Amino acid sequence: AFSGILAEADIAAALKACEAADSFNYKAFFAKKAFFVIDQDKSGFIEEDELKLFLQVFSAGARALTDAETKAFLK
């Protein structure tokens, strides 16, 4: 999904940095271009369910965000 936008090494490093629950820092991870990929239903909004699966946009095997991480992302 991010082919041509982010390098595979950058994606792997970012996922490695937030493997542990409650370690996801959206300010360090989020980029404007990512919005259009995360907005899976192309509604122009990113819903909570789309945020929970945010890391899986980068890699299908990545974990879902915790409720706390999702709420922090929404702030």
Curated annotation (Swiss-Prot):
Molecular-function GO term, any one: calcium ion binding
Domain EF-hand: 26-61
SUPFAM superfamilies for the chain: EF-hand (SSF47473)
Keywords annotated in UniProt: Acetylation, Allergen, Calcium, Metal-binding, Muscle protein
Pfam families attached to this UniProt entry: EF-hand_6
GO cellular component, one term: cytoplasm
Modified residues (N-acetylalanine): 1
Binding site for Ca(2+): 39, 41, 43, 45, 47, 50
Other facts noted in the record for this chain: Is regarded as an important allergen. On the 2D-gel the determined pI of this protein is: 4.20, its MW is: 11.20 kDa.
UniProt xrefs under PANTHER family: PARVALBUMIN (PTHR11653:SF12), PARVALBUMIN ALPHA (PTHR11653)
Family recorded in the similarity comment: Belongs to the parvalbumin family.
Task performed by this protein: In muscle, parvalbumin is thought to be involved in relaxation after contraction. It binds two calcium ions.
Name listed for the protein in its UniProt record: Parvalbumin beta 3
Native source species: Merluccius gayi
Lineage: Eukaryota, Metazoa, Chordata, Craniata, Vertebrata
